[in-house]
């Protein structure tokens, strides 16, 4: 959706909305308002290119005509394809995730919240694709904002309780 040109100015800030993504080689890619949604960053440290997707639901039904970035599973596919188009190597891809909080209880019958299911699906789908999950700041009941340094893949996570973490 919001795949942006790789030739970004190093001071450029790219904002990713819910059910959207961006890919860049420089600047900062950010998203905010992460409750049960995820901020899923995938990057190639060797190529110096990163992507950030903001999915809100775990899995896409094959008949669903909503944007693939809305879902964790198909959102991963979209950003991997975009990264490969920007020179990344599939073998070098790494991932970091943030979000998945239980801020609203719309849990399933088995007791898992949407946030829990988003986290679980992200871990499964990344593993199935051979993408190493190297950092996460997930769960709990706090909202989050994520900022990705596109050149390095460093992820800064700011929580609504004032805590900050760099992944």
From Swiss-Prot:
Catalysed reaction, written as an equation: L-glutaminyl-[protein] + H2O = L-glutamyl-[protein] + NH4(+)
UniProt keyword terms in alphabetical order: Chemotaxis, Hydrolase
GO biological process, one term: chemotaxis
InterPro entries, A to Z: CheD-like_sf, Chemorcpt_Glu_NH3ase_CheD, Cytotoxic_necrot_fac-like_cat
GO molecular function: protein-glutamine glutaminase activity
EC nos: 3.5.1.44
HAMAP family: CheD
Entry protein name: Probable chemoreceptor glutamine deamidase CheD
Organism: Natronomonas pharaonis (strain ATCC 35678 / DSM 2160 / CIP 103997 / JCM 8858 / NBRC 14720 / NCIMB 2260 / Gabara) (Halobacterium pharaonis)
Taxonomic lineage: Archaea, Methanobacteriati, Methanobacteriota, Stenosarchaea group, Halobacteria
């Amino acid at each position: 959706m919001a795949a942006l040109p790789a030739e970004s100015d190093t001071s450029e800030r790219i904002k990713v909305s819910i059910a959207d993504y961006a890919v860049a080689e420089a600047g900062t890619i950010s998203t905010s308002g992460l409750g049960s949604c995820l901020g899923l960053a995938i990057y190639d440290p060797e190529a110096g290119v990163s992507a950030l997707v903001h999915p809100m639901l775990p899995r896409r039904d094959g008949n669903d005509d909503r944007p693939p970035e809305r879902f964790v599973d198909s959102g991963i596919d979209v950003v991997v394809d975009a990264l490969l188009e920007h020179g990344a190597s599939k073998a070098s891809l790494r991932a970091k995730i943030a979000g998945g909080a239980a801020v609203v209880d719309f849990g399933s019958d088995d007791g898992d919240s949407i946030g829990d299911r988003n986290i679980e699906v992200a871990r499964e789908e990344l593993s199935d694709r051979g993408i190493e999950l190297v950092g996460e700041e997930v769960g709990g009941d706090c909202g989050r904002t994520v900022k990705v340094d596109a050149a390095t893949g460093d992820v800064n996570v700011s929580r609504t309780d004032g805590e900050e973490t760099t992944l």
